[in-house]
Amino acid sequence: MIGDYGVSGADLAAVAALVHSWGVDFIVTTGDNNYPDGAAETIDANIGQYFHEYIYPYQGEFGNGGEVNRFFPTLGNHDWITDMAQPYLDYFTLPGNERYYDFRQGPVHFFMLSSDGREPDGIGRSSLQAAWLKQALAASTARWKLVVMHHPPFSSGYHGPQEALQWPFAAWGATAVLAGHDHVYERLIIDDVPYFVNGLGGNPVRYSFLLPLASSAVRYRAAHGAMLVEADEAQMVFEFVTVTGEVVDRFVVAGE
């Protein structure tokens, strides 16, 4: 899982090499896939150059795509800048309306949200998007249910908490909530649910922390990296690993 990564260069190349070294089944992003402004002219160099073999259908310049899609992004604020995210929507083939959607891999059900204020279906807890999520979480039979978005509901980073997105995820049945936007790594615990901020995916600008929230358990900003998430029916393991291989954080959610 990578976030705030979409800047072609050495930093992203190092993160991509780390992710490839794991031999992951698929890749999930927490947004800002294509800096600086989500343009069609930069999207393949910022994404396909590093991850084309996970994308289906892939029609870019950097090699062969996958036989099935194994790349699942979320929209970040930078992705919206050009033509209301149309280059992103054209580049990827995703489920549902493509702005927010869900998919299942093994025992894990992913719910990928559109957290920017430009989202036509809204981002507040009474929005159409929130109603979709509440219903979809309730209907899911998966062992684990992960909610992924760009803007963090809670963060001790530069942008801070995004109050509009503080939906009752725990009450609705989410196992964990993952976001980006702040170029840091943080793990917080709210209502016994882990919230992760994962924004060190390759943007050269790393943010500082502000006053830590009371719910903040782990904070890190020294180097780029990615999250490795592994799951079976018994447990989910979340790790944040730097490009040098240091495991900064490891958190386990175990079944009852």
What are these regions (language model features)?
Residues 115, 149-152, 181, 241:
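Short, well-ordered beta-to-alpha junction loops that form the rim of enzyme active sites
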Residues 156-162:
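Active-site His/acidic residue clusters
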Residues 140-156:
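Short acidic, glycine-rich surface-loop motifs adjacent to enzyme active sites
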Residues 4, 31-32, 76-77, 150, ...:
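Active-site glycine-centered loops adjacent to acidic/histidine catalytic or metal-binding residues
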Residues 40-144, 162-176, 182-232:
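Extended active-site neighborhood of metal-dependent phosphoesterases/phosphodiesterases
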Residues 1-46, 135, 155-156:
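N-terminal active-site segment of His-dependent metallophosphoesterases
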Residues 218-256:
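A short C-terminal boundary segment appended to hydrolase-like catalytic domains
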